[in-house]
Every structure is written in C-alpha cells, then in structure tokens.
Amino acid sequence: MKAFHLLLFDGSLIFPECILIFGLILLLMIDSTSDQKDISWFYFISSTSLVMSITALLFRWREEPMIAFSGNLQTNNFNEIFQFLILLCSTLCIPLSVEYIECTEMAITEFLLFILTTTLGGMFLCGANDLITIFVALECFSLCSYLLSGYTKKDVRSNEATTKYLLMGGASSSILVHGFSWLYGSSGGEIELQEIVNGLINTQMYNSPGILIALLFITVGIGFKLSPAPSHQWTPDVYEGSPTPVVAFLSVTSKVAASASATRIFDIPFYFSSNEWHLLLEILAILSMILGNLIAITQTSMKRMLAYSSIGQIGYVIIGIIVGDSNGGYASMITYMLFYISMNLGTFACIVSFGLRTGTDNIRDYAGLYTKDPYLALSLALCLLSLGGLPPLAGFFGKLHLFWCGWQAGLYFLVSIGLLTSVVSIYYYLKIIKLLMTGRNQEITPHVRNYRRSPFRSNNSIEFSMIVCVIASTIPGISMNPIIEIAQDTLF
C-alpha cells in the first residue's frame, strides 16, 4: 500500500507527461481499430493533449521543487518553463503542418505520433535528474527526430539527410555516454546530478584530469543537439532535405531541450570546473556566431539559410548559459528563446505556405511576392527583421537584454562579436526582404507570376500559426519586463 501511494504521488508530478502518453495511446487505438479515419479527429486529439498538458503545467507553477521516482526526475520552475516552451512549439507546429501533410499525402497518424513522442522525450529531458534518465530521454527525443526527418521516404534528399542525421547522432550519443562514464567513475559511482558533486568532493576528484575528459566528451555530445559550430555539419542538410514542418519543429524543440539539459549538467556536476566549461562554451559561441552568419550570406536556399542562421542564433543563446544566474543570464536566455520560437516558427510558416503554392525553396523565387500576396510577404519580412534584431521588434529587445547581461558579466569580447554578427545577419535578411518587395516585372520569377492563393478555408490552420507567431515576433519592448520577471522566477 505504501508503494502504491508513493507511485501515485510520483505520478502526480509527471501529470503533464501522462496527458501526452494518454493522447498517444488514444491515437494508436483509433488508428488501429477504425477503418474510416477522420483526419480532423487526429488533429483534435493531439492538439487537445498538448493544450491540456500546458494547462496542467501552468497549474503546477510556483510549487515547491520536488524529486520523484527515487531521484530520476526533478520538478521545479526552471525545468517547467523549458517544458512549457517545448509544448508551445509542438502546439504551434501541428496547425502549421496540416495543409502540408494533406497536399503531400503523408500518413497523418505516424506524423502526430512522432511529434507527441518527441515532445514527451523533450519534457522528460528537461526534468531528468540523473545520467541514465538524461540519456534515455535524449535518445527518445533523438530517435523520433530521425524518423521525422526521414518521413518522406520517397524523397532522395530526405533519405540522405536522415542517414547523415542518424549516423552523426549515433556517434554523438556514444561520445556523450563515454563522458558520462568518466563522470560516473570520478564521483565514486554516483548518477544523480547533485550526488555527483558530493561524490567528487568525497573522492577529491573534482579537479582531476578525468573530470576534464568528461567535460570535453559531454560538451561534444550535447553540442550535436545544440548544433553550434563545429558540431553543425548535419544541420544544413537536414534542414534542406526534411519536410518543412518537421524542420520548423526540430529547429526549436531540439535547442530548447538541449539548452535545458546543458544548463543543468554544466551548472551542477561541473560546478568546480566552471572556468573550463566557460572557456569551451565561449569558443563554441564565437565560432557559431561568426561561421553561422557569414556562411548564411552565400546560401541560395531559404531552408539552408535558416539552418546557418540558427547556428548563429545558438551562439547568442550560449552567452546566456555562460553568464548563468548571477547576472540574469538564464532569465535573458529563456526570454530570448521564447522570442526565437515565435520568430523562427513564423518564418517557417511563411516558407511552408509559399512552398505549397510554388513548389520552390530558392531565395530568388521569392522576388515580387508582395505584388501577389502582401500579407504573406509582410509576415515573412516582420519575422526576418525580428530574427535580425531590428527595433522595435521582439528580437531586438531579446538580444539587447541578452547582450546587456553578458556585458555586465564581463564578456566584452563575446558580446562585441555578437553585436557585429547581428549586423551581418541583418544584411542577408534585408536582402531577402528587398526581393519580396520588388515590383519590377523583369525581376519577378515565373513562380510568383503563377502564384495562386488557396481558399481561406484550406489554409486557415497555417494562417493561425502564422498570425500568432508574427504577433509574438512584433511585441513591443513594453512587454519585456513581465516576461523577464517570470523568467527570473524560474531560477533554481
């Protein structure tokens, strides 16, 4: 009876995750038992599961931090806000994908199952409190990501991207586990994050070469999920070859989940090696901001350009991880990631809509879009300007707060690189916007000349995601203070 009550108590701490599990089971049951599948029901079940999970998470807000399942999971505000961000990404990505799936005639059930399972893995990864749970949750997230990227099995580019993603992902997981083994051995056989710190103190191994080896391997393993340079090789190919809604989903959820995990791993087990991991992350941030933004200038594909742009963006996020909670670094990182979700998903919603009408992804083919679809052109322009960090859009205030926290922490060189590369990013975003707004007939491509808008009824779902993301991307600076205050409340 005591064990039952303990299980019931621990289960209540993962109630948002249980809602998603119930939604997964319901989808599987309907798909396997019903001959005539009503697609709208599948969307309704998956979207309702995500919204209910968000609601359950918000009801648990400000509760005392708790450890569940014998130390495997921890619930606190810091973990929960990352879980909220992952759920928000998934909720916005489902309506963004509806029209694409219908037009490409992909299997809807499997797509939604993979989305929900990836979300579930990301949520468990955010709350994981020991090395084994971190690895299992990460693999749950990763395996479903591989399946999503190769969802269009008949597409050669998708198959190529999935193969690269799978091989490099498997290698990075092996490297991560090797780093965990060094951490496990150095701490005297501990796997819980806080107990590892105590174990390192007891064994006097907190400044040993073994810890530095563990730090190096774990940084490489987590770096693959964050995709900073030089761990970025998979990103452009996967972005270009995968279905666009999948790219939109993975581009934000992978970074949110990996950032949550990286923050806890670096901040707790490597507490005594803060100088070393700060140096490692500074190198990654500098390489990411410079290489990502410079290579993005040369791209001709919108999705490849956004891939390199995301590499630069993760460099900005790493600044917040380095600063930590002493100077508001975590709060600024969370705030910027919230804005990044809206900016990035809004951009991808526009790309999905344009791609379905024209069948092209080439940047040159966007020339003159404003003359045919001013709403889509303006939405894309606003999201790109926000990604570039132009005032008074949300991206500007997010970057401003992030850079200010880095400057206060003494990261002058890192912030200077961030400012310079932000100017570079504005250049290639403005180059696209100039193409969108051109009105000269000789520059308008045949794709735009033959552009057709589908009836509102068939694309209202993607327009819903687009409107939400565009509004969130253009939030004025007056909204920054309450958002930052909420983010600061999450610090552990």
Swiss-Prot record:
EC assignment: 7.1.1.-
Family membership noted in the UniProt record: Belongs to the complex I subunit 2 family.
HAMAP family found in the cross-reference section: NDH1_NuoN_1
Residues annotated as transmembrane: 6-26, 39-59, 81-101, 106-126, 131-151, 165-185, 209-229, 277-297, 305-325, 336-356, 377-397, 400-420, 464-484
Disulfide bonding pattern of the chain: none
GO-annotated biological processes: ATP synthesis coupled electron transport; photosynthesis, light reaction
Subunit structure, interactors included: NDH is composed of at least 16 different subunits, 5 of which are encoded in the nucleus.
Role, per record: NDH shuttles electrons from NAD(P)H:plastoquinone, via FMN and iron-sulfur (Fe-S) centers, to quinones in the photosynthetic chain and possibly in a chloroplast respiratory chain. The immediate electron acceptor for the enzyme in this species is believed to be plastoquinone. Couples the redox reaction to proton translocation, and thus conserves the redox energy in a proton gradient.
PANTHER family linked: NADH DEHYDROGENASE (PTHR22773)
Protein name: NAD(P)H-quinone oxidoreductase subunit 2 A, chloroplastic
GO function term, MF aspect, one: quinone binding
Lipid bilayer topology: Multi-pass membrane protein
Gene Ontology CC: one annotated term: chloroplast thylakoid membrane
Organism annotation: Phaseolus vulgaris (Kidney bean)
Catalytic reaction equation(s): a plastoquinone + NADH + (n+1) H(+)(in) = a plastoquinol + NAD(+) + n H(+)(out); a plastoquinone + NADPH + (n+1) H(+)(in) = a plastoquinol + NADP(+) + n H(+)(out)
Keyword annotations: Chloroplast, Membrane, NAD, NADP, Plastid, Plastoquinone, Quinone, Thylakoid, Translocase, Transmembrane, Transmembrane helix, Transport
Subcellular location(s) per record: Plastid, Chloroplast thylakoid membrane
